[in-house]
Amino acid sequence: MNLILLGAPGAGKGTQAELLVHKLSIPAISTGNMLREAIANGTELGRKAKEYMDAGNLVPDELILGIVADRVAQPDCQGGFILDGVPRTLAQAEALEAAGVKIDHVVSIEVDDREIEGRMTGRRVCGKCGASFHITANPPKIDGICDSCGGELIIRKDDAPETVRNRLAVYHATTEVLKDFYGKLGRLVEVNGSQSIEKANEDILAAIGAKV
């Protein structure tokens, strides 16, 4: 089964991907990992991508999608795969179809923006050991102090309120077009990501007709 996972930052997409990898025994493939592997393996597409990256430029769609097509043709993807980070645009989605990369289901994990803001802006990370906390879901015993090492808890730049709102705006601007595209193809399923991790995962498996 070939899947694409969509979800705003903080929606729990990474957690659901990990569960699906375990339950369906298929790999999750991220754009970043694919690029790193192609470059490390010295493939022709990898070498071309490295030239763009070394020059500080974005890797063109045709190279990204060529690397995707190569990766999903590998033996470990014969039983299916989960794509993460691609497609990001309508042009990439259309090119993926044109390249013959078969997608069975596109799962969109839906969480209200206000809830996502609460999830992300409430996160705290220890500046010393990297331990993670949340001011409501997983608070430290002493406010602002790491339980593990006593280090100071900080707010990452990515979790600052204005940054979170900007990231959500960008996500919606690009993803609504993708949802419309795959919805017209009859492949889009939407799952409530505000419920428990376990219930959301059950709903995903039911929506895609997976037997586990």
Feature locations, PLM:
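Glycine-rich phosphate-binding loop of ATP-dependent small-molecule kinases
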Residues: M1-V212
